[in-house]
Amino acid sequence: MNEKILISYIIPAYNAADTLERAVESITHTCNMEKCEILIVENGSTDYTNSVALKLIQKYGENVKLIHSEKGVSRARNEGLKNARGEWIVFVDADDYIVSKSKKYIYEDILNAKADLYVYSYEIGNRANYINNKEEKTYYFNDSAEKMKLEMIANPTKFMQVWGKIFRKSIIYKIELALIQKCSFQRIVILHYII
């Protein structure tokens, strides 16, 4: 693979044998696999998650990688970040999926990048979480960071999760941010430091 990786999708996978394939397949339908990589970070599963991941690697080749980490979603995401080669980072939970129509929005945004973080809409419920449409997207620049902070407080479910967003990798490293290893609220921490 000689192409520059544009997007690294990081999937923490703990006991995700039943959902991992759908998550990975949804990514392959929304991204040009020559410019994307999918990092499956298996972190202590007791089911057959590892076997599912190996089958996906056989199917998609070097664009899909299996990484092992200690237990914990934050450890898995950190391990994914260490191995990510993409300019942009997308965190996807193993039970999430991204709808195919979002490909247009994702590429349009990052190819014309005006920001370091893009927040998309998603749906929670019987249907898994997914990046939905462009209409709900809002841009925040330096002069409107205070507005975003207020919106984060008003709508924590939308803003305080790492999924449903695309992060420029350099901003994560610029602020020397790693997800807190044992904190179940690491989702809040990453966005607090970015803004």
Predicted regions, residues:
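Glycine-rich, basic loop-to-helix element that forms the pyrophosphate-binding segment
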Residues: 68-84
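Short aromatic/hydrophobic "clamp" motif used to bind/position activated sugar donors
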Residues: 89
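Acidic helix N-cap motif at the loop->helix transition within catalytic regions
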Residues: 19-21, 47-56, 97, 101
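Donor-binding/catalytic cores of nucleotide-activated saccharide
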Residues: 73, 94-195
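Short beta-strand/loop segment that forms part of the nucleotide-sugar
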Residues: 35-44, 65-69, 94
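Short, well-formed alpha-helical segments that are part of the catalytic scaffolds
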Residues: 15-29
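A conserved acidic beta->alpha catalytic loop
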Residues: 26, 42-51
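Cell-envelope/extracellular polymer assembly enzymes that use nucleotide-activated donors
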Residues: 5-8, 26, 37, 190
